[in-house]
Amino acid sequence: MTKRILVLEDGTVFEGKAFGADIDVTGEIVFNTGMTGYQESITDQSYNGQILTFTYPLVGNYGINRDDYESIIPTCKGVVVFEEARRASNWRNQMTLDEFLKAKKIPGISGIDTRALTKIIRKHGTMRATLTHVGDSMDHVTDQLQATVLPTDNIKQVSTKTSYPAPGVGLSVVLVDFGLKHSILRELSKRNCNVTVVPYSTTAEEILHLNPDGVMLSNGPGNPEDVPQALDMIRGVQGKIPIFGICMGHQLFAMANGAKTYKMKFGHRGFNHAVREIATGRVDFTSQNHGYAVSREDLPEHLIITHEEINDKSVEGVRHRYQPAFSVQYHPDAAPGPHDASYLFDEFIEMMEVFKQSN
C-alpha cells in the first residue's frame, strides 16, 4: 500500500495510506459529521476546492451507485477517512469508493486519526492543506502551502454554462445554478414544476423574459461576496415574482437585501444540525454544508429571522417582511440527511400559487 501524507498550513503532518487518484492536491480542509451519505457529499458541488474529511470511522462500505449522485463531475479536491472499506456490500453497488475516486481523479488518504484532525480544525478553523506523496521535504511542502492562494471563482467553476429545461406540467420555476444539487431539482420535479436551470450569471431581465412563476436560488460553494452580479439579479426580480433561496442562495438573498455575511470558524457540514423555527418552536434536524453565514447583528428591518441553529444561534432562515421571498441556510432537499424540512418546497409552491392568483 502506497503511503500518502496530509500537511496542514500550520505544519501538522498526518501520514496514512493512499487510495483514489495518484495526484497531489491543495485545498481548504473541512470536516463532515455525517455517518452515511458519503457519495452525495463527495458529489456536492458546495465542496468545490475543498479536502473533505469524514469524521465517521468507516467510509465506503456500501460502495457507489448510480442513484445518489448530486452532480456528475465532483469537484472536491480530496477525501480523508480513518478507514476505507476495500469491499462494498449493497445491492445497488456499482463500484468501490477507491474505483470511483480514481475515475474522478480525486486522491484519498486513509489510516489517519480523523478525530485528532477534526479537533485541530475545530480549534483553529478551516485552513489550507495538501495531500502529497511521502518523500518531499516537509519544510518545502509547508512553505509552498502557506504561499498558495486558493481560487475565488468556485461558483463560476461549477455553475452550468448554458440553460437547460427539466419539463413539468405545473408551475414554472427558474432555478439559478450556483452549484446545484440534483436533489433540489428532484424535489421541484416531484411537485410537477416546469423548471428551467440557468447559469449563475443570468440577469434579472433574462429571467423575467422567461415569465416564471417563481425563482429558486440554489446552493453553491465559496464566498457569496465573490458573485456581486447575483445581488443585482435578485434585486431585479424581487417583488415581481416569489423567491426561495437555499444555502448559498440564502446568503445571496440576504445580502441583496442589505444583510452582511461572515466566514465561520469551521462551518456546518453534516446532517445532524438542529434548527428551531422561531415562530412555532418546531425543531427540525437538517442537512447542512456551508462555511459562511448571515450576520444577525447587521440584518435590516425588512428581513425577519425565521430559523436559528440551536447550538450556536446562527441565522438559518429569513423572510422578507413585505414581499413574497424567503430563504434557509440548510438543505430541505436533504441528500444526504433527514427530510424534516421538505415542507418548505410546498410552502414555495403555495407562495407562487397565491402570488399568481393575486396578480
Curated annotation (Swiss-Prot):
UniProt-annotated catalytic positions: C247 (nucleophile), H331, D333
Keywords tagged on the record: Amino-acid biosynthesis, Arginine biosynthesis, ATP-binding, Glutamine amidotransferase, Ligase, Nucleotide-binding, Pyrimidine biosynthesis
Entry-linked SMART domains: CPSase_sm_chain
EC numbers: 6.3.5.5
Signal peptide (residue range): none
Entry binding sites for L-glutamine: S46, G220, G222, M248, Q251, N289, G291, Y292
Record-linked InterPro entries: Anth_synth/Amidotransfase (IPR050472), CarbamoylP_synth_ssu (IPR006274), CarbamoylP_synth_ssu_N (IPR002474), CarbP_synth_ssu_N_sf (IPR036480), Class_I_gatase-like (IPR029062), CPSase_GATase1 (IPR035686), GATASE (IPR017926)
GO-annotated cellular components: carbamoyl-phosphate synthase complex; cytoplasm
Superkingdom assignment: Bacteria
Matches recorded under Gene3D superfamilies: 3.40.50.880, Carbamoyl-phosphate synthase small subunit, N-terminal domain (3.50.30.20)
Cited PROSITE patterns: GATASE_TYPE_1
Pfam families: CPSase_sm_chain, GATase
Top class in the EC scheme: ligase
Chemical reaction(s) catalysed: hydrogencarbonate + L-glutamine + 2 ATP + H2O = carbamoyl phosphate + L-glutamate + 2 ADP + phosphate + 2 H(+)
Biological role stated in the UniProt entry: Small subunit of the glutamine-dependent carbamoyl phosphate synthetase (CPSase). CPSase catalyzes the formation of carbamoyl phosphate from the ammonia moiety of glutamine, carbonate, and phosphate donated by ATP, constituting the first step of 2 biosynthetic pathways, one leading to arginine and/or urea and the other to pyrimidine nucleotides. The small subunit (glutamine amidotransferase) binds and cleaves glutamine to supply the large subunit with the substrate ammonia.
Family from the record: Belongs to the CarA family.
Name of the featured protein: Carbamoyl phosphate synthase small chain
Source organism per UniProt: Streptococcus pneumoniae (strain ATCC BAA-255 / R6)
